[in-house]
A protein has these predicted regions:
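Short, intrinsically disordered, charge-balanced linker/junction segments flanking boundaries
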Residues: 7, 75-79
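N-terminal capping/linker segments that flank leucine-rich repeat
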Residues: 1-26
Length: 79
């Protein structure tokens, strides 16, 4: 998944969180290596088994996100 496609998924997820429209992010088993997810609101997102190695997750909201078996090796988790 490229950054532009990921940005669309995040936008729809954030809309789902705000008003129930849009859709919950299902990024399970996605290759998000080195993706920029900084400041993204991923509350409740499905990230099971995702490759997040080297991803920028700084200041992202990961509350209630499912990160089971996700690869976070080298990910930026500041904030």
């Amino acid at each position: 998944m490229n950054q532009a496609e990921l940005d669309v998924v995040i936008e729809k997820h954030e809309k789902w969180l705000r008003d129930g429209h849009g859709e919950r992010a299902n990024l399970s088993y996605a290759n998000l290596r080195r993706a920029n997810l900084s400041y993204a609101d991923l509350n409740g997102a499905d990230l099971r088994g995702a490759n997040l190695s080297g991803a920028n997750l700084s200041y992202a909201n990961l509350r209630r996100a499912n990160l089971s078996y996700a690869d976070l090796n080298g990910a930026d988790l500041r904030g």
